[in-house]
Amino acid sequence: MPALRKHPQTATKHLFVTGGVVSSLGKGLTGSSLGQLLTARGLQVTMQKLDPYLNVDPGTMNPFQHGEVFVTEDGAETDLDVGHYERFLDRNLSGSANVTTGQIYSSVIAKERRGEYLGDTVQVIPHITDEIKSRIVAMAAPDEHGNRPDVVITEVGGTVGDIESLPFLEAARQVRHEVGRENCFFLHCSLVPYMAPSGELKTKPTQHSVAALRSIGIQPDALILRCDRDVPEALKNKIALMCDVDIDGVISTPDAPSIYDIPKVLHREELDAYVVRRLNLPFRDVDWTQWNDLLKRVHEPHETVRIALVGKYIDLSDAYLSVTEALRAGGFFHHAKVEMRWVASDDCELDSGAAAALADVDGVLIPGGFGIRGIEGKIGAISYARKRGLPVLGLCLGLQCIVIEAARSVGITGANSAEFDPATPDPVISTMADQRDAVAGEADLGGTMRLGAYPAVLEEDSIVARAYQATEVSERHRHRYEVNNAYRDRIAESGLRFSGTSPDGHLVEFVEYDAEQHPFLVGTQAHPELKSRPTRPHPLFAAFIGAALDYKAAERLPVEIPEQRSNGVELLQEPASRG
C-alpha cells in the first residue's frame, strides 16, 4: 500500500456541500462518495447533515414525507442521509451527525431562559449562527481513540435561495472566515437541464444558483454538474468562466448505473485530487481493492433472487432505504442480484391475496412500522410463507407479527398487540413498562422510544447464532412494544423458538423456527439493516438471502414444508473484501 505523502501538519479541514436550482440532486450521495474517496486515500473523514426543518428530529415525522428514520449507535433519530454516510465511510456516526433548526432554536431558547446570554437581545446573528457553528466545529473533536478527523464533510440541506437554509449558510461562511480559507472548501451541486426540443444543455440555472450563493458571501470552490448525460468540455469552460471557478473544479456527474459507481465518476473527473490539492492534505493514491470487488459483485452477479418487501409505506421507497440497501448487500455477499417486489401489506390479508403477491418470490421481508393499518396483511404474508417453507425475515414490527401469527396458530385466536388493540384479551405483544406514559399521551413521543444499540444473547445452536457466528451481539433498536413474557410457553407450542434475549433474559430479541420445521423464518426486535455496509453485509441479511437462493434452487412444493433444506447460514464467511 503506498505511503502517505508528507506535508506539514494542518488543522482539520471543513468541506461544505450545498445544492441549488432544485432539491434531490444527490448532495448526500455526492458527499458520501467524496468521503469514500478521501478515506480510500488514507484520510480520516467524518460527515454531518444540517437540516433546515423545525422538527427537533425526524422521529415523529410521516414516513411518506421524510422517508426512513436512521438510528445511530447512541440512539439518535436522524436523517436517512446519515445512513448513506455510514455505509460509504464504513464507520459509525453519532447523533451529532445530524443538526436541525429545531435543535438549534431549542438550545438557544433554553440558554436564554437560563440567563446564559446575560441580558442580550437574542437574534439569528450571532446567537443562532454561533450555535450552528459550535455543532459544526464539534465534529472536528478527537474520537474515543484520540484521533482527530482530517476532513469534516458537512451537507447543508435544502436549496440555496430557501429562507430556511440561510442561517446555516451564514454559519458556514463564518466557519470559513474563522478556520481560514485554506482550511475550508465549498462544493456546490447544481442542475444542468437538457432541453430536448433544442437538443441543448442549459447552464443558466447553474449561473443563477452560484450568483445566489455568492450574494450571501460564499464563493464555491467546485461545482457538481448534475445531468442525464456528460457535460461537454466547452460548456464546462463556460461555467468555469461565468461562475469564477477553476476548470479543474467543474465536475460533470451524469447519472450512474448504481449509487456505488458515483465514487468512480467523481474520481474520473479528478474531484478528489482537486480537493486534496486545494486543502493541502496528506494523501496516497486511491486504494480501489475493496471498492472494485464491490462493483464486480454489483454489475456481474452470478444469479438473481426475488424478495418481496411487505410494507405499509411502499409508495415511497426511501421509507425502507436501509432495508433495501441491506438486502442488496446480502445479495452482493452471494454474488447475487436482489430484485425487489414491493407488496402493499393490505394485499396479503387474505390467503388468496398473499398467494397472488408472493407466489413467485424467493423470500419475504417484513419491515418495521407503526399503527394498525396493514397489520393483518403482514400477518397473512407470514402465515402464507410459513406453510410453504418460504424464507422470512421480520424486523422490529416484523418480529411482533411473527409472534402474533404463531400464537394464533396454536389457538390463541384473540392474540394481538396492545398497539393495535388495547382491549385485546390476549396481548401477546405488550407495551414496555417505561413506555406506558408516552403511549397514554402523558409524555413526549419524540425521542422517547427504546433507541440505540442494545446487547443480546443468542442460543448456541440457533440459526441466528450460526448467522452471526457469535452468541453475544449488539443491534440498534427503535420500539415501544415487546413480546409479553406471560405468553412465551404457550407460543412455544407452535414451534417458535425464542432464540435470543436481552442479557437478563427478560426481553425477546430474536425468534425463529427450527430448520427442521421451516428452513428460515427469523425475526428480530432490532433494526440490523442500520449496521449493514455494502462492503460488509450484515450476517442476518446474508443468511436470509442465502436461504432465499436455496429456496429458489430447490423444487418448490405448494403446501408441504420440505423436510430438509439448507438455510444458507453455513455459506457465511468473511469475504476477502470485507477487511
Curated annotation (Swiss-Prot):
CTPSs have evolved a hybrid strategy for distinguishing between UTP and CTP. The overlapping regions of the product feedback inhibitory and substrate sites recognize a common feature in both compounds, the triphosphate moiety. To differentiate isosteric substrate and product pyrimidine rings, an additional pocket far from the expected kinase/ligase catalytic site, specifically recognizes the cytosine and ribose portions of the product inhibitor. HAMAP family: PyrG. GO terms for molecular function: ATP binding; CTP synthase activity; glutaminase activity; identical protein binding; metal ion binding. Belongs to the CTP synthase family. UTP binds at residues 23, 202-207, 238. This is CTP synthase. Its EC number is 6.3.4.2. It catalyses: UTP + L-glutamine + ATP + H2O = CTP + L-glutamate + ADP + phosphate + 2 H(+); L-glutamine + H2O = L-glutamate + NH4(+); UTP + NH4(+) + ATP = CTP + ADP + phosphate + 2 H(+). ATP binds at residues 24-29, 81. CTP binds at residues 23, 162-164, 202-207, 238. Homotetramer. Mg(2+) binds at residues 81, 155. Coiled coil: none annotated. The active site is at 396 (nucleophile), 527, 529. It is an enzyme of class 6 (ligase). Residues 306-554 form the Glutamine amidotransferase type-1 domain. InterPro entries: Class_I_gatase-like, CTP_synthase, CTP_synthase_N, GATASE, GATase1_CTP_Synthase, P-loop_NTPase. GO terms for cellular component: cytosol. L-glutamine binds at residues 369, 397-400, 419, 480. Pfam families: CTP_synth_N, GATase. Keywords: ATP-binding, Glutamine amidotransferase, Ligase, Magnesium, Metal-binding, Nucleotide-binding, Pyrimidine biosynthesis. Pathway: Pyrimidine metabolism; CTP biosynthesis via de novo pathway; CTP from UDP: step 2/2. It comes from the Bacteria. GO terms for biological process: 'de novo' CTP biosynthetic process; pyrimidine nucleobase biosynthetic process.
